[in-house]
Amino acid sequence: MTDADCCPFADCISQGLYLGDLRAMTSLAQAEAEEQAEWCVVTVLSERDLVGLSLPRHVDHHLVIRADDDLAVDLTPEFARAHAAIASALARGKSVLVHCMAGISRSATIAAAHLILERGIDAPAALAVLRRHRRCIGPNAAFRRQLKDLAEANAARAVPGVAEPQRGL
């Protein structure tokens, strides 16, 4: 079984990195244990959406971020943790599924943050990478601003002689 067979409701963003919706995660949860073991999952759902949800039991690692798709939600505190989980899984040769309910806003924000931190690109470039592979992405305005702030802070850290921004990103 290939990664695409196991995750039919996700789009491959780059080698081993998939962006999808809840159906992608539920498809993975129905896969055989040995197939699940080749995957790591980043779930971004509200507390309400998580109630009663059957999560994959045999994945290598599962990071659950509890967040609504709302303008008042700040995903910034989750960026470094999600990036570390994704980067670690990819370095170990695992496939990674990042998903939310629809695969449009929350999961796209987390995947874009990973690309910003991994590649040192700005927010529009990260979103363009995602959009090339998953045309329906559309982080809400607050999440887009958080990605812009992350990219600016990341760029400032990369420039010698520029004061390092506050920790927490």
Where are these regions (language model features)?
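Intrinsically disordered, low-complexity regulatory segments in eukaryotic proteins
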Residues: P165-L169
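Short, small-residue alpha-helix embedded
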Residues: A108-E118
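Cysteine-based protein phosphatase catalytic domain of the PTP/DSP
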Residues: T2-V96, A102, I116-A155
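Short linear loop/turn motifs
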Residues: R145, A163-E164
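A eukaryotic "domain-to-IDR transition" signal
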Residues: A87, S107-T109, A158-V159
